[in-house]
């Protein structure tokens, strides 16, 4: 087993850690066996060298080992819409809104998320304002998935080992490997995923990581405007993993009949504003907010293997919104989470 000192010297020299070495090192970090100085040095060493696909996959594997898992009785069409965040765009909660639409279309959405990192509100912030009980046990989240096809996994409830790293990350104030691990560590082990990323380089990297981790159908996306979603401002970069193969391409919103818009049309400066925009979309209000939700929900439906193509996914998303079923999913989650959580 590699020592922290040897690992750090390897990173300083610009050399990659082997997969098994990264596994061992990450387990030490997650158990709190390294000093804060050692952990901080290794995290920054990885960042400066630039984390490799193998290193990220090993770290994600360990985080999954240490996570509190959600029991799921039916794994068909199980999808997550969790992105990295960190795009500093201050848009409303697009992926959270899309989750309700995808669930209404028949996907089983195991939504993983937390509080705000760099935006005005994270998924947990807006769901809490809507009245969803976040403090459910893993078994209760599994019950939500079984009964209504939608469950929210509040990250701190499932990744308690992060307590060893959280103060170090806060004190560093810099991005580390942990900024990209969240969407790779779904506690329900969803192997279908729509993941937005904050940097274009991560599109190819995360798709290869998820291939190593055994995912089935995934789209990793990054908008030309920096958005960690499929954007309406112009083309989005996409890496799609399906049947063990990765295809990289650009996706234009016009291909699906959506007009271009600017990021300011999607802005929400507070969690309350984000909640209001989410509700407006679910209530059927037309405009850019609805359009971007349709596009991203369509992608989630497609990656869940409910729809045979992204275009068909968008059509199903539109039907789910127009029928009122997406709004009903929100109401069902509020009611069931409150009932289960007492």
Curated annotation (Swiss-Prot):
Enzyme Commission (EC) number: 2.4.2.18
GO molecular-function term, one example from the UniProt record: anthranilate phosphoribosyltransferase activity
Associated pathway: Amino-acid biosynthesis; L-tryptophan biosynthesis; L-tryptophan from chorismate: step 2/5
Positions that bind 5-phospho-alpha-D-ribose 1-diphosphate: 83, 86-87, 91, 93-96, 111-119, 123
Cofactor: Mg(2+)
Enzyme class, spelled out: transferase
Positions that bind Mg(2+) 2: 228-229
UniProt: Mg(2+) 1 binding residues: 95, 229
Annotated positions binding anthranilate 2: 169
Gene Ontology cellular-component terms listed: cytosol
Keyword Transmembrane set for record: no
HAMAP family xref list: TrpD
PANTHER family per UniProt: ANTHRANILATE PHOSPHORIBOSYLTRANSFERASE
The name this protein goes by in its record: Anthranilate phosphoribosyltransferase
UniProt organism field: Chromobacterium violaceum (strain ATCC 12472 / DSM 30191 / JCM 1249 / CCUG 213 / NBRC 12614 / NCIMB 9131 / NCTC 9757 / MK)
């Amino acid at each position: 087993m590699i020592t922290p000192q040897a690992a750090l010297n390897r990173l300083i020299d610009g050399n990659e850690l082997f997969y098994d070495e990264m596994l061992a090192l990450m387990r030490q970090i997650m158990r709190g066996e390294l000093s804060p100085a050692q952990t901080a040095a290794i995290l920054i060493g990885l960042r400066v060298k630039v984390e490799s696909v193998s290193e990220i996959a090993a770290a994600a594997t360990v985080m999954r080992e240490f996570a509190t898992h959600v029991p799921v009785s039916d794994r068909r069409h199980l999808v997550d819409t969790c992105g990295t965040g960190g795009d500093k765009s201050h848009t409303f909660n697009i992926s959270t809104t899309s989750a309700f639409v995808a669930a209404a279309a028949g996907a089983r959405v195991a939504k993983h998320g937390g509080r705000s990192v760099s935006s005005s509100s994270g998924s947990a912030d807006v769901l809490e304002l809507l009245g969803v009980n976040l403090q459910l046990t893993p078994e209760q989240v599994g019950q939500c998935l079984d009964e209504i096809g939608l469950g929210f996994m509040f990250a701190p409830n499932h990744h308690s080992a992060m307590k060893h790293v959280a103060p170090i990350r806060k004190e560093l104030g810099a991005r580390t490997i942990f900024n990209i691990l969240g969407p790779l560590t779904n506690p329900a082990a969803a192997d279908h995923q729509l993941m937005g990323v904050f940097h274009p380089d991560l599109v190819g990297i995360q798709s290869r990581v998820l291939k190593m981790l055994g995912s089935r159908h995934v789209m990793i996306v990054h908008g030309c405007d920096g958005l960690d979603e499929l954007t309406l401002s112009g083309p989005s970069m996409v890496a799609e993993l399906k049947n063990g193969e990765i295809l990289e391409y650009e996706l234009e919103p016009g291909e699906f009949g959506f007009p271009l818009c600017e990021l300011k049309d999607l802005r929400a400066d507070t969690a309350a504003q984000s909640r209001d925009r989410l509700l407006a979309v679910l209530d059927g209000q037309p405009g850019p907010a609805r359009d971007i939700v349709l596009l991203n929900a369509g992608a989630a439906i497609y990656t869940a293997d409910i729809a045979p193509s992204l275009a068909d996914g968008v059509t199903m998303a539109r039907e789910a919104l127009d029928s009122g079923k997406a709004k009903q999913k929100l109401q069902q989650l509020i009611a069931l989470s409150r009932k289960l959580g007492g």
